[in-house]
Amino acid sequence: STTKGEQLKSFMPSDAKFTYEIVKELSTPNSFDEALTKHNDIEYLFHTASPLTFDTEDPENVILQPAIKGTENILHAAADHCPNLKRVVLTSSDAAIYSNTDETNPTLSFNEGSWNNTSYQDALKDNITAYYASKAFAEKLAWEFVLMQKPVFGLVVVNPSWVFGPKAYDFDPKRFNSSNEMIDDLLKLNHENNSTFENVSGGYISATDIAKIQVYAIESDDLVNKRLLMTNGYFTCQQILDIINKHFPELNLP
């Protein structure tokens, strides 16, 4: 949005080489064509845009299709309009590697060839399943695009686990991304109601570490055609609650 673009611009030095373009709907056909035609001299492209909310009654059109079509649209636009492009860095997720059901399996093992094989029909059952599956569908599409279309650019995929960390700018507290949405939901817990996320656990990664690997992905030729699973450790929601209670005991969370 213009508001977000101007907000980011305000953080930059006056002589910074920063501009922004607005892509209103990721899933609209040719949604990135105008922006990439205007900036067809770029050499590196980061695709980090994907729905990050579990608060919807329409997972297909809010979560699945924007993730899949957004990836398809930006890759086609990049191949068609950016002849000097050297590399695309796609931010996927560990959710592309295993399903939300698999993640709760204590004996789970995986490697760079592992995939979340949730079917499209099963992905429509609930928002969390849809989110996990959307990452797999979008990433598989990206690898298939590179294999079949053989574009001039190389592809690197970053697969972070749950991302926690400070935001670089002020934001609407009614529109959290999924990681912050979980923490906000836990903050509203009392001893009588439940949280959508209270049984969630998984790997986590610092937002600043994700930023570092994004840069490394364009600097290192060794990472082309690689999937990079990113994690700092493992968390449970109870650990988050324990940290909150330690620093804010007046909240008296369960």
Language-model-derived ranges and their functions:
Residues 47, 57, 62, 66-126:
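Conserved Rossmann-fold NAD(P)-dependent oxidoreductase catalytic core, especially the SDR/UDP-sugar
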Residues 120-126, 166, 173-205:
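A conserved pocket-lining segment of Rossmann-fold NAD(P)-dependent short-chain dehydrogenase/reductase
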Residues 151-152, 165-181, 217-227:
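Glycine/proline-rich active-site loop of Rossmann-fold NAD(P)-dependent oxidoreductases
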Residues 96-97, 163-165, 210:
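Conserved sequence/active-site signature of Rossmann-fold short-chain dehydrogenase/reductase
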Residues 2-69, 79:
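NAD(P)H-binding glycine-rich loop region in Rossmannoid oxidoreductase-like domains
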Residues 117-156:
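Active-site Tyr-X1-5-Lys
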Residues 199-204, 211-254:
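Mid/C-terminal beta-alpha module of Rossmann-like enzyme folds, strongest
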